[in-house]
Amino acid sequence: MGQKTHPIGFRIGVTKDWLSKWCTSKKEYPNTLHEDIVIRKYIKERYKSAGISKVTIERSGEKIRVRILSSKPGIIIGRKGAEVDQLKNDLERIVKNKDISLSVDEVRVPQLDAQLVAEDIALQIERRVSHRRAMKRAIDNAIKSGAKGIKVQVKGRIGGADLARAEWFLVGRMPLQTLRADIDYGYATAYTKYGILGIKVWIYKGDILKGGKEEIMKKIEEDLVSQAKEV
């Protein structure tokens, strides 16, 4: 069977960036990584209705910069910033003795954010909307918002069937093996009374690097040199 590489990991250093940016010793690495996982899980569970797409974390010494990308930033910020201040205090209690700075940015076009699209489809399926209707609605909204291509897959015991299967729709182009292609990817889980359904979404927004192979290799080399200097 043909296996697919992760579209985000495949493009890191070319058109995509890391969600966590920090360097640490081998001894501290597990604890630091676990802190990142706890921070992301806490924020996502606390603001389930805020439409959180990504949580990026940067570390410098004892300072942690957390950036939240959300389709509804007002829920996280709160009235006069009261909610975001409370979140900052709660996170500082979790990580212990570290200074946290928070920033909340808006996802301008949620119809083109693969993670938000996947979570919206999962929510509709949990509310007993037909999976095909939810998939086609997401595809129509993405194409109308300017996507060059979109692929949506639902996998599991669809409709309570005895055997698990996968259904997918593809509209437009999806050049998964082209490094310069700006492809966003998201995954969500729908919990139904028959079991768990997995939803995957790929959205192609066009090319970021207009040049050919030479320009892409030059960009990779420049990134490697800059990373070596930082270390």
Curated annotation (Swiss-Prot):
Q: Keyword set for this entry?
A: Ribonucleoprotein, Ribosomal protein, RNA-binding, rRNA-binding
Q: Does the keyword GTP-binding apply?
A: no
Instruction: Tell me which CDD domains the record gives.
Output: KH-II_30S_S3
Q: What PROSITE patterns does this protein's entry cite?
A: KH_TYPE_2 (PS50823), RIBOSOMAL_S3 (PS00548)
Q: Which family does it belong to?
A: Belongs to the universal ribosomal protein uS3 family.
HAMAP family with a match to the protein in the record: Ribosomal_uS3_B
| Subunit annotation | Part of the 30S ribosomal subunit. Forms a tight complex with proteins S10 and S14.
Q: What does this protein do?
A: Binds the lower part of the 30S subunit head. Binds mRNA in the 70S ribosome, positioning it for translation.
Q: What is this protein called?
A: Small ribosomal subunit protein uS3
Organism equals Hydrogenobaculum sp. (strain Y04AAS1)
Taxonomic classification, please?
Bacteria, Pseudomonadati, Aquificota, Aquificia, Aquificales
- Whichever gene encodes this chain, its name is rpsC
